[in-house]
C-alpha cells in the first residue's frame, strides 16, 4: 500500500479486494451523475489499511429531488438491488425523505451493501461539504475528513470503532 498526501487530496495505491471493487463500482455511478456524496464510518479506516471486514458502507448523498433520484435509481438498478425498497418512489418518499437509509447490494447478494442516506443534521451536512478527495488507484472517492472521522469513532466507543480510530 502506498499513501501520498497532496494539499487536500490523498492518493492511495493498493491491491484491490472485493470490497474495494464494490465501493468503486457504486461510487462511480454517483460520480457519473454528479451527485455530491461522502463515504463515512468504517470503510474509511479499511481504505487506509485497517484489516477488518465490513458488511455495509455508509454514504451520505446530497438531498436531491425526485427527478434526479430516479436517474440514480435507474443507473444503480442495472448492477445492484435495493434491499429494503421495491421501487424509486418507495425508496425516496418512504425512506430517504424520512431520513431513513436505503440499502443496495450487488444483484442476488446481501453483503456487503451500501447504506445510502440523506444528511440528518448540521454535522452530516458539514461532513458532506468538507469531504476529502481520494485518488484510489486512479479512481475518485470522497471520504469524511479524518479530523472528524477519528473523534466520531472514539465517541461511538465500541472496540471496533476505537480500533478504527487508531
What do these predicted ranges mean?
Residues 1-166:
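Compositionally biased terminal segments of proteins
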Amino acid at each position: 500500500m502506498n499513501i501520498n498526501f497532496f494539499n487536500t487530496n490523498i492518493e492511495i495505491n493498493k491491491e484491490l479486494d472485493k470490497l474495494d471493487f464494490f465501493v468503486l463500482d457504486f461510487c462511480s455511478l454517483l460520480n457519473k451523475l454528479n451527485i455530491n456524496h461522502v463515504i463515512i464510518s468504517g470503510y474509511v479506516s479499511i481504505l487506509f489499511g485497517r484489516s477488518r471486514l465490513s458488511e455495509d458502507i455508509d454514504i451520505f448523498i446530497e438531498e436531491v429531488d425526485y427527478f434526479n433520484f430516479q436517474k440514480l435509481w435507474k443507473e444503480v438498478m442495472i448492477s445492484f438491488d435495493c434491499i429494503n425498497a421495491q421501487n424509486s418512489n418507495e425508496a425516496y418518499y418512504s425512506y430517504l425523505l424520512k431520513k431513513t437509509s436505503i440499502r443496495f447490494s450487488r444483484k442476488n447478494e446481501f453483503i456487503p451493501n451500501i447504506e445510502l442516506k440523506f444528511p440528518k443534521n448540521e454535522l452530516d451536512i458539514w461532513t458532506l461539504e468538507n469531504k476529502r478527495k481520494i485518488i484510489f488507484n486512479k479512481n475518485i472517492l470522497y471520504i469524511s475528513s479524518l479530523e472528524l472521522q477519528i473523534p466520531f469513532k472514539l465517541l461511538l466507543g465500541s472496540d471496533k470503532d476505537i480500533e478504527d480510530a487508531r
